[in-house]
């Protein structure tokens, strides 16, 4: 510090208004202010010679407090307070001064506001007065302006009228007008425009002045008309010359001149008529190409009639024509926009209409006419290809006109293109006989062609329609349970139409197939059938020394036999479905408004071709094959190869169901009634096929059961009462034959039937055999050795059945095996045996019949010990 009574200058700087405390808080300022005095005390304390043990923290603190001198602090704080007091007084004085200044300025501001308010009011009053005066002046001047404008127009009309009368007088008196001629021949197009306007008005004036009372007026009118025609023709020639020279400035000038003369009607017509695209001889020669397109392009023709090709087919020459037309229209649009300006839209509109009428429509009709001569499929594919081609062509031009900004707000050109496109196709699409009728016939012909080979191969088998008759018989015998139900009514309606539809389809088939080809196929089929019939007799056991020969016959031999199903596959149905989808896609694109109705008709054709013809015929063949089986001639062999028809039919039904659900029904979300009809029709077809399949399987089970019965009838009574044990080494011949059949049945049926269908089929066959065997063994007397033979036979059956994996059958044949034990056990064990295992659930009458067939049944010992217990 500089003195004991004055504050250090560094602290004085912090006690001023411009930098008060220098950013320090009050506590920080006081600490900084006291720091110098505290440091002096600490330094003084450290210089003392204190004992070492007293230099700890407490000792130092105590020593400091003892040596602390408060006077420097008091003086410093007093000086600080003095400075703060002076600063406070200074601040208060400044505050009072500035407050007085603010009050004075507020008074002055208020006085100025009052004064300006008065001045503003005065100004507004003055403005209102001036506005009133101006309004009065406008009311006076406005009529004068209108009158002046009218006067100017009258003056101009007067001048024009005078000019017009003078020019008329020239023609009236001299038959010509030098002034008009000079204007016409001028190099300045605006003067040419003036001459045209004069002639336009002269034509009107001459028509009004023409009268028979003054013959010369008639002649004058003729002269003026002739001159006008000459002038217009010359302008048109100049226009054509300028077009050939690509002089667009000249073209624009002449177009403006003629537009003022007669609206540009003739120049527009001349521009279109004289266009090279319409008069070029090369273009005319190209028309002949469309007449011979199918003759020259054989590959294209093959594509059109190829069932397997489902892509959109576009004829090359038509594609080239459309590309050429599009290029011409785009190029001419640029020229027209520069030449005709405001009339450009109208000119392009006329040009487009002319192109469609002269270039497109004739070739369009020729192409369709020639395609129809090839086939219905070629016709509808050409029509669809043209629709696709012209759709892209129209959209491309519409986008181009929008980009070129040549189409006005009314979208005249877009509307014209769409109208031309619609007019081109409406004549065909909305006439049922020219499109959808042909589409239906095309699809019918395709389905006939795809199913014809299969149908012809099995013509003999399906001739009598035995399965369909069986189906009708099944319906008629279940009137109460079936016919009165909704499903029954559906099947009745379906059945009532199925026969007629199928007869129509067969008639259609006969008319569409080549007669020579048909007769050849039928001859071959009959020969094959004869050979098949002959070959089936090879399996007759009666002609063999032993039935064991037939036991070596396997399912692979049957698969390779001539009776194997042919030309019936999922691939064929898939191909047919693709054709149906193709027809549906065409209908959806060509006639979206009626698509829901036409899809229903297409699906009816599909069901007629695939279900009522293809599948029904296959099932008829399968039923015919099982019905023609002669159980007396085919001992040891059961050919179930016809089950392939059933397995394939099941897969086809699944495919049809999935296709209907995933492809066709989503298209009909907006047509719930049609959708419901299709669902009902689909369910009806599926239900009918299921019934037909069940009839075939039931007949198959019946035939197999009859076969088992016939084989069991060969059982000899002495088979189970042998005199020695010589025959214990082999099963009886009926058992061997039946086991062989069981193995063949399982091997074949497991190939064609799957899941529950296979299990149900095997269960029914096994139950039939079980019932037959249960009854069979109750009719034979059996001795103790014969009981072993019976057991061996049953073990053979049981082993074959266990391979099937059907639990219920395994239990039944286990029961049969336990029944065989009744022939072999000692009499005293019979009672306990019948109360154990499966025999506990068997009826007493069955057990009694088996026991009564024991050879020792009539012995006294047996009667005394057992017989009375089973009465």
Swiss-Prot record:
Residues 74-101 form a coiled coil. One of its GO terms (biological process) is Golgi to plasma membrane transport. One of its GO terms (cellular component) is cellular bud neck. It comes from the Eukaryota. Keywords: Coiled coil, Exocytosis, Phosphoprotein, Protein transport, Transport. Pfam families: Sec10_HB, Sec10_N. The modification Phosphoserine is found at residues 142, 485, 507. InterPro entries: Sec10-like, Sec10_HB, Sec10_N. Belongs to the SEC10 family. PANTHER family: EXOCYST COMPLEX COMPONENT 5, SEC10. Component of the exocyst complex involved in the docking of exocytic vesicles with fusion sites on the plasma membrane. The exocyst complex is composed of SEC3, SEC5, SEC6, SEC8, SEC10, SEC15, EXO70 and EXO84. Present with 2340 molecules/cell in log phase SD medium. This is Exocyst complex component SEC10. The lineage of its organism: Eukaryota, Fungi, Dikarya, Ascomycota, Saccharomycotina. The gene is SEC10.
């Amino acid at each position: 510090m500089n003195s004991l009574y004055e504050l250090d200058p560094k602290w004085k700087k912090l006690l001023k208004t411009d930098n008060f405390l220098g950013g320090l808080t009050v506590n920080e300022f006081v600490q900084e202010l006291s720091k110098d005095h505290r440091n002096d005390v600490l330094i003084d304390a450290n210089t003392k010679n204190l004992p070492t043990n007293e230099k700890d923290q407490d000792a130092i603190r105590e020593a400091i407090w003892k040596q602390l001198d408060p006077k420097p602090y008091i003086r410093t704080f007093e000086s600080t307070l003095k400075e703060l007091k002076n600063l406070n007084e200074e601040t208060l004085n400044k505050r009072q001064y500035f407050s007085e200044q603010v009050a004075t300025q507020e008074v002055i501001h208020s006085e100025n506001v009052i004064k300006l308010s008065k001045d503003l009011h005065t100004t507004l009053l003055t403005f209102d007065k001036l506005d009133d005066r101006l309004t009065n002046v406008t009311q006076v001047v406005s009529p004068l302006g209108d009158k002046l404008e009218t006067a100017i127009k009258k003056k101009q009309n007067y001048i024009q009228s005078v000019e017009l009368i003078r020019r008329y007088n020239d023609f009236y008196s001299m038959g010509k007008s030098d002034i008009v001629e000079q204007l016409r021949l001028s190099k300045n197009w605006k003067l040419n425009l003036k001459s045209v306007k004069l002639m336009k008005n002269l034509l009107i004036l001459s028509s009004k002045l023409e009268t028979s009372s003054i013959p010369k007026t008639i002649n004058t009118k003729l002269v003026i008309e002739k001159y006008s025609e000459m002038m217009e023709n010359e302008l048109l020639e100049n226009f054509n010359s300028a077009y050939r020279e690509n002089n667009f400035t000249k073209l624009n000038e002449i177009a403006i001149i003629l537009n003022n003369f007669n609206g540009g009607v003739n120049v527009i017509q001349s521009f279109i008529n004289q266009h090279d695209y319409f008069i070029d001889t090369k273009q005319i020669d190209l028309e002949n190409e469309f007449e011979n397109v199918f003759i020259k392009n054989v590959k294209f023709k093959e594509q059109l009639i190829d069932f397997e090709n489902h892509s959109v087919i576009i004829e090359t020459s038509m594609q080239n024509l459309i590309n050429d037309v599009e290029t011409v229209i785009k190029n001419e649009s640029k020229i027209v926009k520069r030449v005709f300006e405001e009339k450009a839209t109208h000119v392009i509109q006329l040009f487009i209409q002319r192109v469609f009428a002269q270039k497109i429509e004739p070739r369009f009709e020729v192409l369709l006419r020639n395609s129809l001569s090839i086939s219905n499929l070629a016709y509808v594919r050409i029509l669809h290809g043209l629709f696709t081609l012209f759709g892209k062509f129209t959209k491309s031009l519409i986008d181009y006109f929008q980009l070129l900004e040549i189409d006005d707000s009314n979208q005249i050109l877009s509307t014209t293109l769409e109208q031309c496109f619609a007019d081109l196709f409406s004549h065909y699409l909305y006439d049922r006989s020219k499109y959808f009728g042909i589409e239906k016939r095309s699809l019918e012909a395709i389905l006939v062609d795809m199913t014809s080979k299969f149908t012809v191969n099995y013509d003999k088998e399906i001739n009598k329609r035995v399965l369909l008759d069986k189906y009708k018989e099944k319906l008629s015998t279940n009137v109460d349970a079936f016919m009165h139900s909704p499903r029954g009514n559906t099947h009745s309606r379906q059945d009532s139409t199925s026969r007629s539809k199928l007869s129509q389809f067969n008639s259609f088939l006969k008319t569409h197939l080549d007669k020579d080809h048909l007769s050849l196929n039928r001859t071959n089929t009959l020969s094959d059938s004869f050979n098949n019939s002959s070959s089936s007799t090879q399996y007759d056991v009666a002609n063999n020394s032993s039935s064991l020969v037939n036991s070596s016959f396997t399912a692979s031999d049957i698969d390779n036999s001539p009776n194997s199903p042919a030309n019936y596959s999922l691939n064929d149905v898939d191909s047919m479905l693709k054709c149906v989808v193709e027809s549906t896609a065409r209908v959806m694109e060509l006639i979206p408004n009626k698509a829901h109705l036409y899809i229903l008709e297409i699906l009816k054709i599909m069901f007629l071709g695939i279900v009522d013809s293809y599948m029904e015929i296959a099932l008829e063949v399968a039923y015919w094959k099982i019905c023609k089986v002669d159980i007396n001639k085919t001992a040891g062999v059961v050919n179930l190869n016809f089950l392939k028809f059933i397995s394939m039919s099941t897969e086809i039904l699944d495919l049809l169901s999935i296709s209907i659900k995933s492809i066709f029904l989503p298209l009909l979300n907006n047509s719930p009634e049609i959708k419901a009809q299709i669902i009902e029709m689909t369910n009806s077809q599926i239900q009918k096929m299921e019934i037909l399949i069940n009839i075939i399987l039931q007949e198959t089970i019946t035939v197999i059961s009859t076969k088992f019965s016939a084989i069991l009838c060969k059982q000899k009574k002495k088979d189970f009462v042998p005199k020695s044990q010589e025959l214990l080494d082999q099963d009886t011949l009926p058992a061997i034959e039946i086991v062989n059949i069981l193995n063949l049945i399982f091997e074949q049926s497991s190939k064609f039937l799957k899941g529950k269908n296979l299990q149900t089929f095997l269960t029914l066959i096994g139950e039939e055999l079980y019932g037959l065997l249960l009854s069979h063994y109750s009719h034979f007397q059996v001795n103790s050795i014969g009981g072993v033979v019976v057991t061996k036979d049953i073990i053979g059956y049981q082993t074959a059945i266990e391979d099937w994996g059907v639990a219920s059958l395994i239990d039944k044949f286990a029961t049969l095996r336990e029944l065989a034990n009744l022939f072999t056990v000692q009499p005293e064990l019979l009672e306990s045996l019948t109360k154990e295992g499966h025999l506990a659930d068997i009826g007493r009458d069955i057990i009694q019949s088996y026991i009564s067939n024991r050879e020792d049944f009539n012995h006294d010992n047996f009667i005394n010990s057992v017989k009375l217990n089973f009465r």
